[in-house]
């Protein structure tokens, strides 16, 4: 029988970086949703744009921190887990789909459901590709 995997000790600096990034990301998302409110029964474009933009940004970030740059050890936890994790939102996306369905906007809900997933995946692919192209990482 193999020994159970050991969980590494929690690093206070990493936890702080994630917390600060997450707070900033959530604040940015809140401000965008305040500046771009969604009327009842309409597609929540603010959340859509936030999620797709965040997916593009995580694609760029992961190439930069894993393939192109030597970075500070706190950049990935701060920007990836914290900032972009706090900025994007799956729970709000799910709630907004339910809200659209309850308001009778079934086509909008289904379009938002599928469109977000497809656009988010495209965002990651495009972000990764753009970062590799811009840094020359694809040629290494």
From Swiss-Prot:
Membrane topology summary: Multi-pass membrane protein
Gene Ontology MF annotations: fluoride channel activity; metal ion binding
Residues that, per the record, bind Na(+): 85, 88
Transmembrane residue ranges: 7-27, 45-65, 77-97, 106-126
Activity regulation field: Na(+) is not transported, but it plays an essential structural role and its presence is essential for fluoride channel function.
Assigned keywords, A-Z: Cell membrane, Ion channel, Ion transport, Membrane, Metal-binding, Sodium, Transmembrane, Transmembrane helix, Transport
Subcellular location: Cell membrane
Catalytic activity: fluoride(in) = fluoride(out)
Any one GO BP annotation for this protein: cellular detoxification of fluoride
Domain of life: Bacteria
GO CC list: plasma membrane
A Pfam family the protein falls into: CRCB
Chief location category: membrane
Family the UniProt entry places it in: Belongs to the fluoride channel Fluc/FEX (TC 1.A.43) family.
Function statement: Fluoride-specific ion channel. Important for reducing fluoride concentration in the cell, thus reducing its toxicity.
The protein's name in its UniProt record: Fluoride-specific ion channel FluC 2
Gene: fluC2
């Amino acid at each position: 029988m193999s020994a159970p995997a050991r969980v590494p000790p929690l690093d206070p600096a990493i936890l702080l970086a994630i917390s600060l990034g997450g707070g900033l990301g959530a604040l940015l998302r809140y401000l965008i949703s305040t500046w771009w409110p969604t009327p009842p029964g309409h597609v929540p474009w603010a959340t859509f744009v936030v999620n797709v933009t965040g997916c593009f940004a995580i694609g760029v970030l992961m190439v930069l921190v894993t393939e192109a740059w030597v970075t500070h050890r706190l950049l990935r936890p701060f920007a990836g887990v914290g900032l972009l994790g706090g900025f994007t939102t799956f729970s709000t996306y799910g709630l907004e789909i339910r809200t659209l369905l309850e308001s009778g906007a079934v086509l909008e809900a289904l379009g938002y459901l599928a469109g977000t997933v497809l656009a988010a995946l495209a965002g990651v692919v495009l972000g990764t590709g753009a970062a590799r192209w811009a840094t020359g990482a694809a040629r290494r």
